[in-house]
């Protein structure tokens, strides 16, 4: 094994019997709710929208579940990032400017502007959907976590964000 040591993994026991997902009365009452947000951007940057999502989740009367957040675009994305220090999101945006520059002569897709293909690449390197647990009618985000729309185009845009909550 070329000097490598085998690591023995701990064994886990599976619970025997069926897994039940029921409320106190014994019946399963899983709800599914959806909502669409429109976020208007002023061009490139990270736009926080944790508050809007939190208000909607609280209004849904779902104690425990999973929230999916989906960006309906290919030139914008979603990130969960620190929300305490604004320099974090500025540094993140600056990093993507350096890693995926505009006006690269190797880009073939240029019909929608010189910022479009880099926007697609940046969106591919991040995420267009997020999944967040919901407990106690609240998103189970960490203390310093916020949800951001990451706009990758220079011009103002209207971005559709679909929220889907499933739980009981």
What are these regions (language model features)?
Residues 19-168:
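Active-site histidine-anchored catalytic micro-motif
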Residues 1-28:
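N-terminal amphipathic/basic-hydrophobic helices that include classical n-h-c signal peptides
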């Amino acid at each position: 094994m070329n000097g490598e040591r085998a690591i023995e993994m701990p064994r886990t026991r599976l619970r025997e019997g069926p897994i039940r997902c029921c409320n106190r009365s014994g019946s399963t009452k899983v709800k599914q709710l959806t909502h669409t947000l429109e976020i208007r951007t002023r061009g490139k940057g990270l736009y926080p929208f944790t508050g809007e999502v939190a208000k909607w989740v609280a209004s849904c009367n779902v104690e425990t579940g999973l929230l999916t957040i989906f960006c309906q675009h290919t030139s914008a994305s979603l990130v969960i990032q620190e929300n305490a220090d604004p320099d974090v999101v500025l540094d993140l945006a600056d990093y993507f400017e350096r890693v995926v520059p505009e006006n690269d002569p190797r880009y073939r897709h240029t019909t929608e502007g010189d910022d479009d293909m880099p926007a697609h690449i940046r969106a591919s390197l991040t995420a267009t959907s997020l999944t967040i647990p919901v407990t106690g009618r609240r998103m189970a985000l960490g203390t310093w976590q916020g949800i951001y729309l990451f706009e990758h185009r220079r011009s103002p845009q209207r971005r559709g964000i679909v929220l889907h909550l499933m739980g009981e």
